Amino acid sequence: MVEEDTQKTEEETSEDKPQVIFLSNEGSDDDPKIRKAMLYGDIDESSAKDIIATMILLADTAESQELSDPSDPGSEIVSVVRPFEIVVSTGGGNADDMMSVYDMMRMIREDVDIVTTGIGKVMSAGTLLLAAGTKGKRRIGKNCRVMIHAVTGGSIGPMHELTNEFKEIKKIQESYIQCLANETDMTVAQIKKYLKQKTNVYLTAEEAVELGFANEIF
């Protein structure tokens, strides 16, 4: 869940240590043009730093020179921008760190396609990152669970500080809602209706595609 305290804004976390695994810069044997990385576990400063660094590397190495006709060694050499893939499986994490990854994805996808793949669970902060892939290149496993919910938080301190923190929580939620609306087929009003249920809202892979979090199920 998205939580706010005087130090951090967090989403629901698990006990597992966050992992960002850099899989390849050269691509798989099946598709050498696709480079991959994995975001697995909680989204926090450490995992956000690692996935951002990986995305920057993959973006900086996206352009390559290839034969226009691979079967003809004498064909013209052309410049090709190779996409990369981020595999996401997370229960959520820190909202600020989510936004740092999201903003980097927005910047990079202007020049390089980002394929996003959701597996296992894509919840809370993870839903925005799944949806932030290049339109038409976002996919989700048929058994993947998706969950969205409202920002939550807690603080201890003088009343004036608590009032200030509450205002900030509201700002974070409004920003989160607007970003989801920008990346999915949902309107701001639809998202707010879901969040007003004041509970975790779970979606099947089919529902996630219908609402625009992903484009296809595998």
Region annotations inferred by a language model:
Residues 1-218:
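Terminal-region recognition feature
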